[in-house]
Amino acid sequence: MVLNIPLLLSGVLVPIVLSVLLPFLGRSLGKKSITAIAFILLLYPLALTVFFTIQTGLREPVVDPVIFQSDSLGSFSALLDPLSAPLAISIGLVTTLIAAYSLPYMEHRFEEMEKEKISAPDWGTYYMLYVMFSAAMMGTVLSTNLVEFYIFLELSLLPSFLLIAFYGYGNRERIALMYLIWTHVGALVFLIGSLIVGLSAGTFDFYDPISLQPNMGLGSAVSPALRLPVAIAMVLGLFVKLAILGVHIWLPYAHAEAPTPVSALLSPNLIGIAGYALVRVAYTLFPDEFSHLTNYMLPLALLTIIYGGLMALAQDDFKRLLAYSSISQMGYLLLGISTLTTAGIAGAMVHYAAHAVGKALLFTTAGVLIVQLHGLRSISKMGGIAPKMPLTASLALIGFMHITGIPPSLGLWSEVLIISGAAGSVLSKSAIAFIGLLIALLIGIGLSTAYAFLTMKRIFFGQPSEAALKAKEAGWNLLAPMAIIAAAGVLLFIWPSILIDPLVSLLSSLLG
């Protein structure tokens, strides 16, 4: 379905453009009014994506009319289809609700910074950067063109860098710079590959908004000697963004020390976009070369799952544990993609949504504990908090269920799809490889379950700690956004077919 006006892109550009006014409005309006404006700006793209998803049932792509066309660059449009919808809905849901959560949390953070005599820009600047970051992420997953994708990818990097540098914890400026350098280098490596493809093919479109078809094999226009190196460059650049083992160094620092509302966007939403781009961009442009690279990607995915799980298990800082957990979860995402099966890739896209819900709940739980326990993040100093904070404990449990695949969580369906795709793919190659896969998955799933529920026990149950004696339940201004995210996750567990069925249909065609 081609729209008459570019509604999808308006959901990206309107929030970005209007967010520039927030620092000026912040001088005359109160923090609640600024929060409400930011919430409404982000509610708009969420409403658009949900409306078109329900209206079409994702049985056909929803495409904006071309808003820009050039003989050398191709055309700029926006696409909502079964592949992009799980990400667009997840980004819209989490960013909108975390905007509301930011009000009470950042009140606490501003008070902390004032006590520490740290100066930072005010509410208007915070929400301007927050809205830009959120809308740019939406822009990346709706893009149809390599240049368009790269612009939004970089636009998501700069505001998130400033949010960490201005409002983060610890050595926030140094950590923000590390985050900027690592992820910008990854984006540049991806850009180099993109430029070679676009200049060789005469277009940067990886999806044709006129024919409503992906430009499969567009990379074949590249010289045969360069095809594999270019494909490797694009994949490697995305691996940095995905924080795969070996290029993950930046993530535990950035995600742990970012202000918690930003952590709740970085970990579930931003990094997973690179997994989507592996399928939407890298596989579309270089199907043969990508297929060859999956022989190396699959074992790397398993190593990432295990490494992230082991490191999470060793952490005492709750936010740092969640950061390493995200590395492990991105391993599952890569595992599904590297199978190049319908089930595996469908599972990876559904896992993005499951991880978005689960990790958003867990980072916001960490934020609640920071606010209610006066900045406490050390798990060893917690314990026995559940009787004092039963609602927070319940929401944290739902979050852990999503990342471990326990019903009623969407993570159950993503895990089943990824494992079935991986088993089918590896079994067709060799029995020994299949046994190795089973062993690695048992270790990985065991580690995920261990760090999730040991952490749950250490924080919320057991002997009451000194912190537990002083604890009290958070207010609804913190808990209500979390409860809505949790409810959305359970709804998708009950109604997964709205995402999975169209995905299976599209991937069956895409993979041939």
Segment roles from a protein language model:
Residues 1-10, 20-128, 208-213, 504-509:
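Transmembrane helix-loop-helix hairpins at membrane boundaries of multipass inner-membrane proteins
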Residues 3-14, 84-92, 147-159, 227-240, ...:
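Structural signature of hydrophobic alpha-helical transmembrane segments
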Residues 20-28, 97-114, 162-171, 242-256, ...:
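C-terminal ends of transmembrane helices
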Residues 104, 110-121, 228, 232-296, ...:
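Short helix-boundary/re-entrant hairpin motifs in multi-pass inner-membrane proteins
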Residues 125-132, 136-222, 240, 312-379:
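Alpha-helical multi-pass transmembrane bundles of energy-transducing inner-membrane proteins
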Residues 210-211, 258, 375, 386-391, ...:
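Cytoplasmic/organellar membrane-interface segments at the starts of transmembrane helices
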Residues 245, 359-363, 435-471:
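Predominantly late transmembrane helices and immediately cytosolic-facing juxtamembrane segments
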Residues 282, 334-343, 415-437:
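Interfacial segments of multi-pass membrane proteins
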